[in-house]
């Protein structure tokens, strides 16, 4: 694949998405966008050579919007990285917990810190924003608190401790390239989306394609299909090099067993 000169991620600067982008493509010029759909748009329209998105958190699970976008957009995951997430509570200097009436952050960050918020800020309204870094602008409100801030700014006080429910908190990020640039020919992990036939045993039939060949599943997650109430799309990650005849055979059999089947990523 071509070199990465420009990489898109969720902004503004100072987010974990920016850190993941520096990690996955350290030489790239980073372009920040306000929403995840805008990140995908930049990649598809050629304004960036690659994009970086969070896809799963070890506490809060899949980043559902990005799972849904990856399934329908013209992008494919070609690399991944897992970053340790250290969430702090940010306030203006001198603000006490009892004075905080609103807590702002991305839905994922608030979900990852639910126990702390339930215990110490049960009275505070929880308001979702597009990104944790963008929430910092809201600290002009005296009664505001921000979850997830990890960069210091003038007049901002950070909690001394990580407030996440679990201290071993990691988020997986994908490096995306345009699907038209081709799929990697090698990679020890394959990520795909599948919709099984709506009949007894169809999911078992899909999973048997891999179990019968000793191929391990490292992730399986279901998402409702909005246009078909009561039916689900499965997002599945397997351990296996896509260049292996055994893995290719399993994927081909899985494709034939499903109503729809789409490979979303091949990476190490």
Residue positions per predicted region:
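Domain-level signature for soluble enzymes in the chorismate/prephenate branch of the shikimate pathway
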Residues: 1-268
């Amino acid at each position: 694949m071509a070199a990465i000169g420009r990489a898109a991620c969720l902004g503004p600067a100072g987010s974990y998405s920016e850190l993941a982008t520096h990690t996955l493509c350290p030489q790239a010029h980073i372009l920040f966008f306000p929403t995840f759909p805008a990140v995908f748009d930049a990649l598809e329209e050629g304004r960036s050579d690659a994009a970086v998105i969070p896809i799963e958190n070890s506490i809060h699970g899949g980043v559902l919007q990005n799972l849904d976008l990856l399934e329908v957009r013209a992008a494919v995951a070609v690399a991944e990285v897992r970053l340790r997430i250290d969430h702090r509570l940010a306030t203006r200097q001198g603000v006490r917990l009892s004075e905080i009436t609103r807590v702002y952050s991305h839905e994922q960050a608030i979900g990852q810190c639910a126990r702390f918020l339930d215990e110490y800020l049960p009275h505070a309204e929880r308001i979702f924003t597009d990104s944790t870094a963008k929430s910092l602008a809201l600290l002009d409100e005296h009664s505001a608190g921000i979850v997830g801030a990890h960069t210091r700014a003038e007049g901002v006080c950070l909690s001394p401790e990580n407030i996440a429910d679990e201290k071993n908190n990691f988020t997986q990020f994908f490096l995306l390239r345009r699907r038209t640039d081709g799929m990697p020919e090698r990679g020890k992990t394959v990520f795909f989306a599948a919709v099984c036939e709506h009949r007894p045993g169809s999911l078992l039939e899909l999973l048997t394609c891999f179990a019968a060949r000793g191929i391990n599943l490292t992730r399986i997650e279901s998402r409702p299909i909005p246009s078909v109430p009561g039916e689900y799309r499965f997002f599945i990650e397997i351990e296996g090099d896509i260049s292996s005849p055994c893995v290719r055979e399993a994927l081909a059999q899985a494709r034939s067993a499903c109503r729809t089947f789409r490979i979303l990523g091949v990476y190490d």
